[in-house]
Amino acid sequence: MPKIIEIPGRSGFYLRVAVPRGKLRDAFGTCDVVKKIGNTKEEAEENISSAEIAIQQKFDEKLREEDAKQINKSLPKGIRLEAIKNSNSKEPPKNIEKDLKDAGFSNAAIEALMNFDEKESTNIEEIEQTVPSPCIANNSPRAKFEQFKADSNYLNEPLHSELLNDSDHFTNDAVQLLKFHGSYQQDDREHRKRGGTGKDWQMMLRLRNPAGYVPGPLFVALDELSDRLGNQTLRATTRQCFQMHGIKKGNIKEVIGTIVKSMGSTLAACGDVNRNVMAPAAPYEQGSYPAARKLANDIADVLSPQKAEKTYIDLWVDGEMKYAIKPSSEVKKNRKLQLKPGVFSGDKKEPLYGATYLPRKFKCATTVPGDNSVDILTHDIGLVTFTNKKGVLEGCNVYVGGGMGRTHNLDTTFARIADPIGYVEGEHILELVQSILALQRDYGDRKTRRHSRLKYVLHDMGVDWFKKQLTSKYFTRQIENLKHEGDTILEDYLGWHQQSEKLWFVGLPLLSGRLTGRVKKELRNIVEKFALDVRLTPNQDLLLCNIGNYQKASVKRALINICLLYTSPSPRDQL
């Protein structure tokens, strides 16, 4: 049985695929049960799937009921003839599984159909109450951009072809793919104000810097690239990563390639994937801070697209795979879990995301109890880490569904703080994170991008529905009650702080995250001279890290010379 149900739901007519309730939840969730095929009966009949046609056209419309019953006995278990039309043949249909697959049903749905017990089928009203916005899980119509992503050969074309031509800009199609590689195309309108004609095309490039970490050699490379091939500035963002501006199309490959070869990456810094993972910028070497930073790095790697990374390496460093992500043992182990039912996208090349990736961007952050510098409730996933006395991760409080974005004068978009869902043991955290992402992949709105973030799934369907879907289909580990976190503060880390017994870090304020002119040049000199690393904060400030006890006075003098520290410092600057 697929068939047209001639009783309308609240919003149209459906192709009904009845599946036993228990098997349904285990295999693929409720949304494959009903496939909407029209708002009216006439529209539904015009959109009958190839599977229905293949089954129904083999039967005579006037076939007697007794003959239909006899034919049903020869059909595969779970398929029942209920609509008969358009054929004089009385032979039972063949290749039903292939017909269903051609019609767009998932393997899990087909398997469940073959084992269907009609007595356990659910009804249309129950199903409608469990169907969220248009999404992969309910086979709803999707925006054209979703098909464009699927046709891009894992974010490759037409970007690859257009990198080779002499145009001064990318087409809109290539620009959409360029985002996944960390870049946006922009028009410098100031060019026309200065008397120029036409559009002055240039690229903005965003890096991926988990926990805000920028190794010294990468900072030096960024400074040189921004001066030579950019607009002579760098900008720290509120997601703890650097941006470069003013890059011409003809230079974009050299810029990204140099970044990759200098310990950096721009992969997944933009686009419908997991973005830069945040964590407290302070490089403290005690307490839960090291575990929170490591977890941020592991999340960034485990949620990185895999086949798209191969595309990225091919495009920007000519396929030199030595520059690919070097995942930790925990990441390697959890990547294997991306092939398990529920989490698996159905695409072995891109097991977590699939060829259409996510409906929209996805954001994660980690922190420690008492430190809310990353604003933990404003992310799709927020994790508060708990460690033992040796600093080993024991588990995390988990929050989901936050996000501050909204569209002006559009009430259907809104900011939302994340909901707590419980505490999960540390050894299962990466599995949990990729399970939540898979749920958003399946249930996020694929038709209306302004309504596509995880926060709208939580708002529309509720926390109880979310937890039920998560634990029945994607993540079968135990979720415990939240642990007490204590009071929190919003730390900015400006001034001098002791990093460890022999090391210091100093927080430097930047105006709107902008680095330019003499300050940028001298910071580069300080980083090179003293072999320091850089970390970026959610306040768009900059930390110089790993300053030895014997280096502190010299670094302090150099910073005073460029007015980033003062001769009459605050009490903590006098440390």
Spans of features found by a protein language model:
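N-terminal helical hairpins
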Residues: 38-123, 127
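N-terminal basic/disordered segments at the start of proteins
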Residues: 132-203, 213-215
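Short glycine-/aliphatic-rich beta-strand segments at the starts of folded cytosolic domains
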Residues: 191-212, 497-513
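Short amphipathic alpha-helix segments
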Residues: 213-228, 513-529, 555-556
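Hydrophobic or amphipathic alpha-helical targeting/insertion segments
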Residues: 242-301
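Mobile "lid/hinge" segments at catalytic clefts and subdomain interfaces of large enzymes
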Residues: 353, 358-455
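Terminal amphipathic helices with adjacent charged low-complexity linkers/tails
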Residues: 441-497, 551, 555
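Single conserved hydrophobic/aromatic residue that forms the stacking wall/gate
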Residues: 566-575
